[in-house]
Structure formats: C-alpha cells, structure tokens
Design a protein with these regions (language model features):
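OB-fold ssDNA-binding interfaces and closely related basic DNA-contact patches used
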Residues: 1-120
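Exposed beta-sheet edge/beta-hairpin loop segments within beta-rich domains
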Residues: 132-153, 161-171
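Extracellular structured ligand-interaction cores
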Residues: 40-42, 110-112, 151-155, 169-174
Length: 226
C-alpha cells in the first residue's frame, strides 16, 4: 500500500520562540486597531535583540515574508518595496517605528524589532487565536489576561500574507500563542486607545492557509535594515 502523501507545510507560517507580548489586552476582548475599525483580537510581538532566539526568529520571519510576497503576486522581495515605500504597511518593523500619538517610542521597543498581528479571520470573521499556558493547556477566557499578559514571553505561530486592500501590504495572522508565563508585566497605568495603532492592522483580507500546527532590506534608511 502506498504511503499517504503528507501535505507540505506552508512556508508563510512560522513558529517564533520566546518573543515578548505587547498590547495583549485585546486577546481577551476584541478592540478596533484603528478608529471606527472592526474590533479584533490583536497583539504585538517584540523580538528582543539580546535574546538567544533573536537571530533564529529573524531568519524565520525573513523566509515567511519572502514566501508571502511570492504567493501573493510572484514577487519574493515584495517586502523590500513595502519597507521603502510605506513601512507602516509591513507588519514587521524596527521597534523605533512603533510610537504613540505624541511620537514617543513605546517602552521596550527601542533597539528591537516587532511584529503587529491580529487573530485569524480578517474583518469578515475575526476570531481569537488559540491560546495555551506554559503546560500547553488551553487558556479559559476568564484567565486570558492572567496568562497571556503584556510583558510575558511566549512561543507563537504566525502566518504572513500579502494583500492590496487599502494599499500593498504584508500582514500577519496570529494562529496560536503559548505563554511561558515569565516576564515582568508592561503597560501598567498607560492609557492606550485605537489611535495608538497603525492602520496596517485593519485589512479586509486574511490569511487562508495552514493553521497552527535576519531579514535583509535594501532601504533608503540604513537604520531600517533588518
């Protein structure tokens, strides 16, 4: 009997190790990422430059971005074009580009890189990603903010995808988060509303592919080289 053919993994979907959660409150209750936008479950993920997983995570992101561009419009270097023309429409950016309405870089972002992402389903059917605790047990809704809190380190599965809704973009969908339940809480006492988020997170298109199971940029701004 012939062996069953195993479906190859989607190269746009990657697992990142020990990244830090930020703006994690909407993992429990949906919130709009832009003014008057569709409420979604969203979160940012900080890749800390002093982490032992930093370089490996960067390489995974690079490969996923290349695959997303290639599958969207046949351009594996699409992310470079977006980075140069409109960096806010690329979900993976230098930490210094994540600022509040006063133009101040968010605490914990400087010197690092970060990914902004929302749960699967896009605007039409926004859903919460799968959430697990340190022991890989599913997190009850009532405990989400105690387990998947801003500042916690986590292993995450993200899917990157290209879209031209609202402008040429590459976004990321959160498939699953496993909180390691380590790390000091961040964001306490800081007021945050929808205006603090970039419009890039509110696309109509969503990744439709395999679910959870050092990026090189030629940019006019040297500080954006990943």
């Amino acid at each position: 009997m012939a062996e069953a053919t195993k479906k190859p993994a989607d190269p746009r979907t990657v697992q990142l190790k020990r990244v830090r959660l930020s703006f994690a409150d909407s993992l429990k209750d949906k919130k709009p990422t832009v003014k008057d936008g569709v409420p979604k479950h969203s979160c940012n993920f900080i890749l800390e430059s002093d982490s032992p997983t930093y370089e490996e995570n960067r390489e995974k992101v690079k490969k996923a971005l290349i695959a997303a561009g290639e599958q969207f419009n046949g351009q594996p270097e699409l992310y470079k074009r977006i980075m140069e023309d409109d960096p806010k429409r690329l979900c993976y950016r230098k930490g210094e580009r994540f600022k509040n309405t006063e133009g101040e870089v968010y605490k914990g972002y400087a010197g690092n890189w970060a990914i902004s992402a929302s749960g699967p389903g896009g605007n039409k059917n926004p859903r919460r990603p799968k959430l697990f605790d340190r022991s890989r047990k599913e997190v009850p809704e009532s405990e989400i903010l105690d387990v998947c809190y801003s500042g916690s380190y986590a292993d995450v599965i993200l899917s990157f995808y290209g879209t031209d809704t609202g402008g040429l973009s590459i976004f990321a969908s959160i498939e699953a988060i496993r909180s390691l339940q380590e790390g000091e809480r961040t964001g306490g006492g800081v007021y945050v509303d929808a205006s603090d988020f970039d419009e890039v997170d509110d696309a109509d298109d969503a990744f439709e592919g395999t679910s959870a199971a050092g990026l090189g940029v030629s940019s006019a701004a040297d500080e954006d080289e990943i």
